[in-house]
Regions:
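Bacterial Sec-exported substrate-binding components of ABC uptake systems
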Residues: 2-78, 186-216, 263-267, 272-276, ...
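Short helix-initiation/N-cap motifs at beta->coil->alpha
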Residues: 56-59, 115-122, 249, 293-303
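Structured C-terminal subdomain patch of bacterial secreted/periplasmic proteins
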Residues: 71, 170-173, 180, 305, ...
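A short, structured surface patch at a secondary-structure boundary
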Residues: 71-125
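Alpha-helical, coiled-coil/dimerization segments enriched in small aliphatic residues
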Residues: 101, 227-256, 282-297
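Proline-aspartate-enriched helix->loop->beta-strand connector
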Residues: 130-136, 310-314
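Extracytoplasmic substrate-binding proteins
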Residues: 143-219, 276-284, 350, 359-385
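Ser/Thr/Gly/Pro-rich low-complexity, disordered linker/stalk segments of secreted
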Residues: 254-286
Length: 385
């Protein structure tokens, strides 16, 4: 005889069993969706990275930037140099003009948007190329806020101030920072190890030797100190720059007349970097003493002064050749006079002309630039293989 209660119970059991089976079947899908969500969140977090760089006031800041950016705007040649060395130069969509030979692949690429110069950016052009990130140098710090409205701005400096980290450590730190944006930090260590070995060989050669370091510009010879341009010669390589004191003394007088510059400064308003100019030394506006620094283009010195210093070596950087000044007198012509030729350094063939002045002047701080700079010194000193 049919039992209604048992039948009802049986139906409830079947329904419960079916529900249990359904939940069991759904569980992997639900858990899978949860895991997918977690992975998506993790992937999203991995799309940005936090780096340390400078803001428009030259203060160190933590900046969140895209990880592995695909569209890069370049307004700093040292940064382009580093990106090129890391093999990610194909991400560049716009750049400032340059005449540096080893960057000609970029300057001659008509697909790249011209963005102005390293001194003055074309904001409309920068917006046009729709960058994920923008790299700038010292001369564009005043445009930092405007550029930041377009994309994150990475402002790195070559810290050649008198009490700064110097060229080598600046390259190491800046290259590592840029590499971290692509997960390529390990590549920098190997590159810098080779540079460290070359610096050590140059240091061994320079030990106990004196030098005058200078820049030829507008027909004159300007002495440089152990900061700013060419500071690697007196600081990292270790030549005793016998003109450094005179440069600082004269620059202190200039500073009190209100001079200022841009190259090789430190964060927090004490100067600027890379392709920029030198900063002046003496006293701050409050009358407090500040660190000795070299002026924008060094300090003009008479040839009598250079002769009286009687250095073992004279290093010469040709500014007019670096910037392509038409009709300018070349450094070799300026230095070809009786006073200079009477010097012991000239008679010993120890006047070293830096063969790639545009690299020294506009791209200092890059990896390939450092290679060229060290090669100029090695060749000039007879150390090249």
């Amino acid at each position: 005889m049919f039992n209604l209660f048992e039948a009802s119970l049986s139906r409830r059991s079947l329904i419960a069993a079916g529900a249990a089976l359904g939940l069991a079947a759904l569980a992997p899908a639900v858990l899978g969706n949860v895991n997918l969500t977690r992975r998506a969140l993790a992937d999203e977090a991995a799309k940005t990275v936090t780096i340390t760089c400078l803001n428009g006031a030259k203060e160190a800041i933590e900046l969140e930037v895209p990880f592995d950016p695909q569209r890069i705007a370049i307004l700093d040649l040292a940064s382009l140099d580093i990106l090129d060395s890391l093999g990610v130069g194909d991400r560049v969509v716009g750049m400032a003009s340059t005449s540096i030979d080893y960057l000609s692949t970029y300057s001659e690429n008509t697909d790249l948007v011209p963005l102005g110069t390293i001194k003055e950016a074309d904001l409309e052009a920068v917006m046009e190329c729709e960058p994920d990130v923008i790299f700038i140098g010292g001369r564009l710090s005043s445009m930092y806020d405007d550029l930041s409205q377009i994309a994150p701005v990475v402002f790195l400096q070559t810290d050649t101030a008198a009490d700064g980290k110097g060229v080598i450590e600046s390259v190491r730190d800046n290259a590592t920072t840029i590499a971290s944006m692509f997960g390529l930090e390990d590549e920098i260590a190997g590159k810098m190890e080779a540079f460290d070995q070359r610096i050590a060989a140059l240091q061994e050669f320079a030990a106990g030797k004196t030098a005058v370091v200078g820049m030829c510009t507008s027909g004159s010879f300007n002495v440089l100190g152990n900061d700013g341009r060419c500071s690697i010669i007196g600081r990292e390589v270790g030549f005793d720059n016998v003109a450094a004191g005179a440069a600082a003394e004269q620059n202190g007088q200039d500073h009190n007349q209100g001079g200022s510059g841009e190259h090789g400064g430190k964060p927090e308003g004490t100067g600027k970097q890379g392709e920029g100019e030198g900063q002046d030394e003496g006293k701050s506006g409050s009358g407090e003493a500040v660190a000795a620094v070299t002026a924008t283009h060094g300090n003009e010195a008479s040839f009598e002064t250079i002769v009286s210093l009687d250095p073992d070596y004279v290093f010469v950087m040709d500014r007019d050749a670096a910037i392509g000044t038409e009709g300018a007198q070349l450094a070799r012509e300026i230095m070809d006079n009786e006073l200079v030729q009477s010097m012991r350094a000239a008679q010993d063939n120890h006047i070293v002309y830096l063969e790639h002045p545009n690299v020294w002047y506009t791209a200092e701080g890059g990896i390939t630039a450092l290679d060229y700079m060290l090669a100029d010194l090695e060749q000039g000193l007879g150390l090249s293989e």
